[in-house]
A protein has these predicted regions:
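A contiguous strand-loop segment
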Residues: 27-133, 154-306
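Bacterial N-terminal signal peptides that target proteins for export
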Residues: 1-11
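Glycine-rich, aromatic-lined ligand/substrate-binding cores of catalytic
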Residues: 237-382
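Sec/Tat signal peptide C-region and signal peptidase I cleavage site
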Residues: 20-26
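Substrate-recognition/cap regions that form aromatic- and gly/pro-loop-enriched pockets
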Residues: 337-471
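Ser/Thr-rich, Proline-interspersed low-complexity disordered segments
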Residues: 14, 18-20, 559-578
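Second-shell loop/turn segments in exported
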Residues: 124-128, 136-145
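Histidine-centered catalytic/metal-binding microenvironments
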Residues: 451-561, 573
């Protein structure tokens, strides 16, 4: 195959990264240690913000023949936007596990969960000749690893052997016992696949069992303790390039984040989300507001044990009740809408150049979100499950997916993002979210009431489903898998069908600025955001005309018209027809 010049590839790749940066730098991850959770489970989350592959596909594991290869595709996470191209291949292993594929593969049958966020990092370590992007490593790690620690080591070893050709990434790799925060960047511009040198710089840090981690599109790993191999892992030769480049000197703390991430002074998109999630879980800390030039602690102890509801609340958040509340102010429009569409840089006032609207955790351009937990008192296929939500986290309805299921309904595995499709579950949630933009104040509450009908039921029956699955598991893991697959598929189909019904009910209820009640009566909802009404200029043109015409602003004060000086003569009658 003809090879394009190295620097041509580098330039193209960097341009692609920069073009995608506005959407790629947009994910939020929360991880909860087992002693920090209310029920003793580990928890991990991921909101995949931007245009990414939302389709959930179960990829079966199995045994493989010697010499079998695995195709590696570039940027598979954007498969609904562009068709990925094959970049290379690596040898397959003898046995693989079933895993769940989506933009960023997130679970396997062994109970390992992965949440992801992008942070890109400095250009000096980027190298497009590396074999893997982060989604490739997640796929291979979940196929081949049965614990979080093992998955981290597998991904790191593969990246070192074949090269990492992506920007800086963070993965929260979780099983029922521990959580590892894994971060990775490229090997440097001069690395070559045939060099025999490590093809990546990576490190991982174990989250303390009684603490909570939050990451939001910047490196959060901090200082690597090379004397603590129980709680840290790292790549071979990780200090070599930083020392050669003058980024680090022997005897200094090896701060992975400062060395490999870019300077984010004056940026708030990441730190604001970190602050908000930490503040919701530990308000007693009264964490200060910081920009991207500073870091919060790697992890914190929550004020109370964390529940699933706490995590759902975090992913509903639009900074309500804070100085940064996106539901108030002129930009929230007449109906208190927290969502902000992109604005061109030349439309931003000179005084605000370099800044933008506040970055909240829940955004309307999200592709999907999941909140997962691994419960060690049950077999992994039962104890590990995630709650998957399509589209905006604050308007979705989460559905349960157990690690042991063997398939999911087709409606959740399809959906071309370039063409509206009522056969796709994702489009149901995207449609409802878009319709809600018309009357956010009214429909947002109704959406939450509707999703509670489903989610409350799923939560209420969870203990019974777990118990029945565990009973069947003792007889046969296959029976348990069949039971969980049937349950999960029924739940997902119920929500898919119900959400389309709900969508059309909203269309028939909210239109033309009115709310149509079931009895046929119509209600004018008005404008509920006083900030917008006050700034809207309502009545200004008519007030100005009243002043111009009458010298006053009200009809009551307008002077009466004066009577004419003389009475007009009576009109002459027309002559009668003869």
């Amino acid at each position: 195959m003809k090879r394009i010049g190295f620097w041509s590839i580098t330039l193209i790749a960097i341009l692609v990264v920069l073009c995608c940066a506005t959407t790629a730098l947009a994910c939020t991850v929360v991880a909860v240690g087992k002693e920090a959770s209310a029920d003793g489970s580990t928890m991990v989350t991921h909101s995949c913000d931007g245009w990414y592959d939302h389709r959930v596909v179960v990829v079966p594991g199995g045994t493989h023949a010697e010499g079998e290869m695995v195709d590696i595709y570039r940027d598979p996470c954007q498969d609904t936007m562009v068709t990925p191209e094959k970049f290379g291949e690596v040898p397959q292993v003898a046995e693989t596990y079933t895993y769940f594929n989506v933009a960023y593969p997130f679970m396997n049958e062994k109970g390992v969960l992965i949440g992801e966020h992008t942070w890109t990092g400095i250009d000096d370590v980027y190298n497009p000749e590396g074999m893997f992007v982060i989604a490739n490593l997640e796929m291979l790690g979940l196929q081949r690893g049965s614990t979080a620690r093992e998955v981290v080591q597998i991904m790191g070893d593969l990246a070192e052997q074949y090269g990492y050709g992506d920007g800086g990434e963070m993965l929260a790799v979780t099983d029922a016992n521990e959580i590892w925060i894994f971060e990775i960047v490229g090997p440097g511009m001069l690395w070559k696949p045939e060099s025999g040198e490590p093809g990546a710089h990576w490190a991982a840090r174990r989250l303390a069992d009684d603490e909570v981690f939050v990451g939001a599109n910047r490196s959060r790993l901090g200082v690597i303790d090379f004397n603590d191999t129980e709680n840290f892992m790292w790549s071979e030769g990780i200090t070599d390039l930083p020392e050669q480049m003058g980024w680090w000197s022997e005897g200094e703390d090896f701060d992975f984040s400062k060395i490999f991430d870019s300077d984010r002074t004056g940026q708030f998109g990441s730190s604001r989300r970190e602050w908000r999630a930490f503040d919701l879980l530990a308000p007693s800390l009264e964490l200060p507001v910081i920009d991207g030039g500073s870091q919060y602690d790697f992890s914190i102890k929550p004020d109370e044990k964390v529940t699933m509801d706490d995590l759902f609340t975090i992913y509903n958040d639009h900074l309500e009740g804070t100085p940064y509340d996106q539901t108030v102010g002129v930009a929230a429009g007449p109906y208190g809408n927290p969502n902000r569409n992109s604005i061109k840089s030349d439309q931003i006032p000179e005084s605000a150049q370099g800044y933008g609207f506040e970055r909240k955790i829940a955004i309307h351009t999200c592709s999907y979100v999941f909140i997962g937990q691994a419960r060690g008192w049950l077999p992994a296929e039962i104890g590990t499950k995630l709650w998957y939500g399509a589209d905006d986290p604050s308007t979705t309805c989460y559905v349960p997916i157990y690690a042991g299921v063997t398939e999911v309904p087709e409606a959740w595995s399809i959906g071309d993002r370039r063409a509206f499709d009522q056969d796709s579950a994702w489009w149901a949630f995207n449609f409802v979210n878009n319709w809600a933009q018309l009357r956010w104040d009214a429909m947002y509450e109704e959406i939450h009431a509707e999703r509670a009908k489903y989610m409350d039921q799923f939560m209420a029956e969870e203990a019974d489903i777990d118990a029945e699955a565990a009973k069947l598991y003792e007889e046969s893991p296959e029976k348990a898998a069949a039971f969980l697959t049937e349950y999960t598929n029924n739940a997902m189909n119920t929500v898919y069908e119900g959400w389309w019904d709900f969508a059309w009910r909203l269309v028939g209820k909210y239109y033309d600025g009115l709310c149509l009640e079931e009895d046929g009566s119509r209600t004018t909802l008005g404008m509920t955001n006083p900030d917008f009404v006050a700034a809207s200029g309502i009545g200004e043109t008519m007030i100005a005309d009243m002043e111009a015409i009458y010298g006053t602003t009200t009809e009551e004060e307008a002077p009466a018209e004066e009577a004419p000086a003389e009475e007009a003569p009576a009109a002459t009658e027309a002559p009668a027809e003869e």
